[in-house]
Amino acid sequence: MPRHTSAHKRKPSTPRRRSPPASLPPPAGSRTRRHSGPSGSSPRKKHKFRPGTRALMEIRKYQKSTGLLLRKAPFSRLVREVCQMFSREHMMWQGYALMALQEAAEAFMVRLFSDANLCAIHAKRVTLFPRDIQLARRIRGVEHM
């Protein structure tokens, strides 16, 4: 027969209920906050930024980053599709070649958009129009196309 010491005694299966203490008025300095749950009369409003703030945050984020902006798989599909348009035979591409091509393409696009933005600012606008991009390409010349 096993011995039962005070450390190995079983606890009762159900916890015992204690009666609540006599209700006392809460102290004057402390107020309790009650949460009524999801069916509350005034749900918390979602924080909204002012117009343009989110765009400026996004601009700062992408100016700090050095990674690629386009996804690799769609860019590689585009490169393969363009290669099929210009040659009948199937071309194989190394991963490093695709990455180098993507780096060059993104650098070209960033420079083109910054030049087009300067054209829009010169025209006293902040919105880019296709004519700004066309003017930027025309000013750059043939060797930069």
Curated annotation (Swiss-Prot):
Disulfide bonds: none annotated. Residues 1-54 are annotated as: Disordered. The keyword Nucleus applies. InterPro entries: Histone-fold, Histone_H2A/H2B/H3, Histone_H3/CENP-A. GO terms for cellular component: chromosome, centromeric region; nucleosome; nucleus. Residues 51-145 are annotated as: H3-like. Residues 1-19 have a biased composition (Basic residues). It comes from the Eukaryota. GO terms for molecular function: DNA binding; protein heterodimerization activity; structural constituent of chromatin. Signal peptide: none annotated. Keywords: Centromere, Chromosome, DNA-binding, Nucleosome core, Nucleus, Phosphoprotein. The modification Phosphoserine is found at residue 19. It is found in: Nucleus; Chromosome, Centromere. CDD domains: HFD_H3. Component of centromeric nucleosomes, where DNA is wrapped around a histone octamer core. The octamer contains two molecules each of H2A, H2B, CENPA and H4 assembled in one CENPA-H4 heterotetramer and two H2A-H2B heterodimers. CENPA modulates the DNA-binding characteristics of nucleosomes so that protruding DNA ends have higher flexibility than in nucleosomes containing conventional histone H3. Belongs to the histone H3 family. Histone H3-like nucleosomal protein that is specifically found in centromeric nucleosomes. Replaces conventional H3 in the nucleosome core of centromeric chromatin that serves as an assembly site for the inner kinetochore. The presence of CENPA subtly modifies the nucleosome structure and the way DNA is wrapped around the nucleosome and gives rise to protruding DNA ends that are less well-ordered and rigid compared to nucleosomes containing histone H3. May serve as an epigenetic mark that propagates centromere identity through replication and cell division. This is Histone H3-like centromeric protein A.
